[in-house]
Amino acid sequence: MSSSKYKRVMLKISGEALSGKKGFGFDFDVTQRIAKEIKEIVDMGIEVGAVVGGGNIWRGRNGEEMDRTTADYMGMLATCINALALQDSLENIGVKTRVQTAIEMKEVAEPFIRRRAMRHLEKKRVVIFAAGTGNPYFSTDTTAALRAAEIEADAILLAKKVDGVYDKDPNKYDDAKKFDKLTYIEVLEKGLQVMDSTATSLCMDNNIPILVFGLDKPNNIKKVIMGEQIGTIVSK
């Protein structure tokens, strides 16, 4: 067993992270590395739920000339492709996994049923939640916050391409300042790019800490679980 203070976590992985340096599609070396890092914490006794974004395949802003609802549904389907890719990488290394979707597609995945998801987690299966909330106008960040509340996760691990939360884009500004700790209110008031305001508010209302870190370096998921200060913690 681990000495982590977290028993059950929700891992949110951006779709872009799966594309690595390619910027689109999949970098399977990255997908396999993420799977190995998830296996590490599963082997420590941590129960893991996961939500993957769809930005490596489709982003709503790509469809500016489209109906917003249609564009959002396309994004939801993109997350299903990513969920199946992650499931495959996990099962190839012996991690028992289930994909649950908010839009029914029973030939490829289970429908989202909270009690069933909880049972899978108790049996040490990784549960990947796909197709967002099943509704347009909600991001995968909101999905992660909602599912985290539903499965009673102790924290959200927010894996991004940057290594924490900054006051401005560190890729554009050399003087960008990184925060070690923030409150939910500070994130909302400053308009910081952590999660969108709906997701942040959900975490605040349910007292779910958000641990923001970069996926660029190996073993960061385990480091965050073990309490190493490598990113930004958002809490009360």
Swiss-Prot record:
Pathway in which this enzyme or protein is active: Pyrimidine metabolism; CTP biosynthesis via de novo pathway; UDP from UMP (UMPK route): step 1/1
- Key words of the record: Allosteric enzyme, ATP-binding, Cytoplasm, Kinase, Nucleotide-binding, Pyrimidine biosynthesis, Transferase
Give me the Gene Ontology terms describing cellular component. cytoplasm
Q: Which domain of life is it from?
A: Bacteria
Q: Name one GO molecular function term.
A: ATP binding
Region span, Involved in allosteric activation by GTP? 20-25
Primary location group: cytoplasm
What is catalysed by this protein?
UMP + ATP = UDP + ADP
Q: How is its activity regulated?
A: Allosterically activated by GTP. Inhibited by UTP.
Is Mitochondrion included in the keywords of this UniProt record? no
Q: What is its EC number?
A: 2.7.4.22
Q: Which Pfam families match?
A: AA_kinase
**Which residues are listed for UMP binding in this entry?**
54, 72, 133-140
Q: Could you provide one GO biological process annotation from this protein's UniProt record?
A: 'de novo' CTP biosynthetic process
User: Which major enzyme category is it?
Assistant: transferase
Residues the entry annotates as binding ATP? 12-15, 55, 59, 166, 169
Cited InterPro entries:
AceGlu_kinase-like_sf, Asp/Glu/Uridylate_kinase, Uridylate_kinase, Uridylate_kinase_bac
Q: Does this entry carry the keyword Transferase?
A: yes
Give the quaternary structure: Homohexamer.
Task: Tell me the protein family, please.
Answer: Belongs to the UMP kinase family.
Q: Which HAMAP family match?
A: PyrH_B
Q: What does this protein do?
A: Catalyzes the reversible phosphorylation of UMP to UDP.
Name the record gives this protein: Uridylate kinase
Look up and give the organism this protein is from. Answer: Clostridium novyi (strain NT)
